[in-house]
């Protein structure tokens, strides 16, 4: 056996894959023990990177792309990017070295009304910068919050470099009052989003305080720190990172229209710094440039999701998002601030996997907006092209990211669920009646077959995400993406088909959804949840009635049905006990409350147990002809559902915190 050779390179590929410490020898101890080939990634030569940059600059010059028309104005650590502005560009050389952005460490500039921007802030109202010192947690709690962030949040965002920020946090333990303003804003934003990722029970167990109190404290501290850093005029990357994390926290309780405006603000802040242009990053160290790419693409994802929730259209023009390259597939351990070059993308999955897949799917959706034009909406050819593009996307994601990943790692598992669910939802989007209500009755047997198969698949992935113990740390994120449109479609298709294997399987899936989302039953004040319960009870009632009419065995009542009936009966009794002087000008009680009062007498409560999730082989359980009557069995007002979905999207946990989570005007009062 040859003598082990000590190396100074990165961890070997097998150790990176298993996320364990490599002892730095060739072969290393792990590879010797497991018999694996001990290989290390090669660092790309600098000339390759320069060649790519030169090629992009040449391409931009030949095509007239605005990516090469901008200019970076630098003053110390401050960087401002200007483009398509003849005045600023003509004076660019004269401005080099001039303070074009305020220094967060000195008194802020005065506005024309002689009011300090840090004292009267357009976004956060009046703040008191001197009060932030009392918001710092103890050293023990501070490090616990950091560990929660690294475990629950960082793998899903990747907008900062973990090892670097950890040093900053450790330095605050000894002298927190001397922490630079931008760093302080970033640290408190980390604390805030870490608390958002925890349950109330976890907060009480770890920190001895209710979750709502911790949220209020760190939200206020983050806003104060951002105001102190004069974030509206800052070009410091740490300030933008802090604001982006703050937006991630706000999306759990914030009014969607306001959140969309705030993500637009983050987009403008990034554009001012040139994050959307690859040419603005060429003179930065490779580490800094890569970090800016990560921040920019997370902002693009945030803004795109906010646009969906508000019903705003997404401009298919890619120039809106610039030409910044996607971040490369590297773990934090492979990014070294002092490195003169960036290593080649890892040939294996890294902790960037989730973000990489989200970015690739997001970019694909933006590009395909052009394909989903009038042609695809009105012609068979357009739909065929779109389905072919979806198949190609699915094949690309599977082969590049999912085929060889370690399925034992929770992040990889979540990524697989996300990617496969997204592909199914893309297929559903072509024929989903909620997008074309006037054509809901014109669907063919094959189209209904496809709708049911893919809707079941999407809902199953949500159930798997909630029922897998290893993914509990990511539920704060998963809860924001429940596929309401798909769930409504699944329930509505069952109303016209009361019996059969496919229906039995679908109802078991529906029951598990209610099991993992108890707020769908308990939160009777939410109009969307109330409507979901009504359409579920209506579909179940049709199933029971049909069984009796045909003289077959009445299906066993599911727990979700018993719970929905009980919730409505309880609300009906409470309403009947209200004084007759009740103000009738308020929100009306949903009309279908009568369904609970008129429910069949054999609703005895859910005494049975929920079956395990059906196997994937159950997806093709019925032919399109058998399913053809499903869409005609219930009269669904898809415009009504679209209005409900546009006005909803909060997680029940976040809704419970609204009474005490102080975000001034950000709270959705609905």
Swiss-Prot record:
GO terms for cellular component: nucleus. InterPro entries: Sec_Metabolite_Reg, Transcription_factor_dom_fun, Zn2-C6_fun-type_DNA-bd_sf, Zn2Cys6_DnaBD. It is found in: Nucleus. PROSITE patterns: ZN2_CY6_FUNGAL_2 (PS50048). Disulfide bonds: none annotated. The keyword Metal-binding applies. Residues 57-76, 92-115 are annotated as: Disordered. Keywords: DNA-binding, Metal-binding, Nucleus, Transcription, Transcription regulation, Zinc. Induction: Expression is regulated by the aurofusarin biosynthesis cluster-specific transcription facto aurR1/GIP2. This is Aurofusarin cluster transcription factor aurR2. It comes from Gibberella zeae (strain ATCC MYA-4620 / CBS 123657 / FGSC 9075 / NRRL 31084 / PH-1) (Wheat head blight fungus).
